[in-house]
Amino acid sequence: VALSTYKWDYAPYLLYMKRRLKERLYLPQTFVRDGVISGQVTIQFRLLRNGNVENLKMIENRGHSAFISPTLNTVRASNPFKPLPNSFPDPYLDLTWTFVYSIY
């Protein structure tokens, strides 16, 4: 996750986001059944104060392209997140996340 420095305690909120994304990650069983594949997908999106996601896009893919759709769908399934903390100083938070996959 790439963040600017803000005067708010972002660690608990980002840990919440990470848990929520992991809970909603779905990889087709064929990925596991077919053996070794790996990939890395970097996405960007804007998180509004109310927790809604906007402007979700894939910005980089390394490795197997089959991970792109599940990555984007994971964020869609997690939307909305809980609202940003009251101490967050801006109307939105731009985030960059990298999902790293290794299936053996």
Predicted regions: what they are:
Residues 27-33, 83-84:
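Active-site phosphate-binding and catalytic loops of NTP-dependent enzymes
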Residues 36-42:
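Short, small/polar residue-rich loop motifs at catalytic or cofactor-binding pockets
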Residues 1-4, 19-25, 46-60, 72-83, ...:
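Conserved "boundary/linchpin" sites in short secondary-structure elements
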Residues 60-66:
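A short acidic/small-residue loop/turn micro-motif
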Residues 1-20, 30-33:
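Intrinsic-disorder/low-complexity signature in envelope-associated proteins
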Residues 34-36, 88:
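A short glycine-leucine-enriched loop at secondary-structure breakpoints
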